[in-house]
A protein has these predicted regions:
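Short amphipathic alpha-helix in the helical subdomain of ABC transporter nucleotide-binding domains
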Residues: 5-8, 125, 129, 148-155, ...
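Generic hydrophobic, amphipathic alpha-helix propensity
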Residues: 7-19, 33, 54, 58-66, ...
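Amphipathic alpha-helical interaction segments
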Residues: 11, 32, 61, 82-90, ...
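Helix-turn-helix
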Residues: 11, 19-53, 57
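Hydrophobic alpha-helical connector segments
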Residues: 57, 68-101, 114, 152-155
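Amphipathic alpha-helical packing segments from all-alpha helical-bundle domains
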Residues: 67, 113-141, 149-153
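Helical hydrophobic small-molecule/effector-binding pocket
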Residues: 81-107, 119-130, 187, 191
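C-terminal peripheral helix-coil segments that are non-catalytic and often amphipathic
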Residues: 93, 127-139, 158, 164-205
């Protein structure tokens, strides 16, 4: 089926994904994919389908690749706190790499996915974290009553903030600082630790 990521040849998917990263959805074209892949436009059209189908397939490929790289980092850790910290370090490193590229070229993968392919990314992310949260519950690392689905969504949203929000009190260029920042708060957050309500002073404009 043209445009179905499950049946598409990897080289064309990679070419489509790279084209999307470099040009963005607005400038993306089947001709550009053909030039990247070194094939004819007709081959791209017959394989990927329409321009929209090609973009969708490229986004799906990028989403799967991002989750795969995240999984590789996470699987090296044994506790939920360390797993989330490792994911945060990876996303922060990705953020630094994106910042070093020329403006208008090579759009960041995560930003691209969050803006245009967020449904697949969010679904895959939640499915990635659910068994890890359940394992943490079994180990007693987080509260037994923790809802794995809700906790996974919370982890996902927190991690994506490392890409979307600028640093204030934490040095995102330091993997050690990122690990400590996440490790100090992730378990307490999932355990629902209660703290006295503190009055926050309003900042003058």
């Amino acid at each position: 089926v043209p445009g179905d990521p499950k049946t598409l040849p990897t080289p064309l998917l990679v070419a489509a994904a790279e084209t999307l990263r470099h040009l963005g959805p607005r400038r993306f074209s089947l001709t550009a994919v053909a030039e990247t892949a070194g094939v004819s436009r007709g081959t791209v059209h017959n394989t990927l389908g329409t321009r929209d189908a090609a973009i969708s397939a490229a986004l799906d490929h990028l989403s799967a690749a991002f989750i795969e790289s995240l999984t590789a980092e996470i699987n090296q850790q044994t506790t939920l706190a360390d797993q989330v910290a490792a994911a945060a370090v990876l996303i922060s490193a990705h953020r630094r790499k994106k910042a070093s590229t020329p403006r208008g070229i090579n759009q960041g993968v995560l930003i691209l996915l969050l803006e245009h392919g967020n449904e697949a990314l969010i679904r895959r992310s939640v499915q990635l974290w659910k068994p890890l949260v359940r394992a943490a519950k079994h180990r007693g690392e987080v509260a037994a009553g923790t809802d794995a689905g809700r906790a996974s969504e919370w982890i996902m949203r927190m991690l994506f903030s490392f890409e979307l929000l600028p640093p204030i009190h934490v040095d995102l260029d330091s993997p050690r600082a990122v690990r400590r920042f996440v490790g100090d708060h992730i378990v307490a957050g999932l355990n629902g630790a209660s703290h006295p309500t503190q009055q926050v002073k309003e900042i003058s404009a």
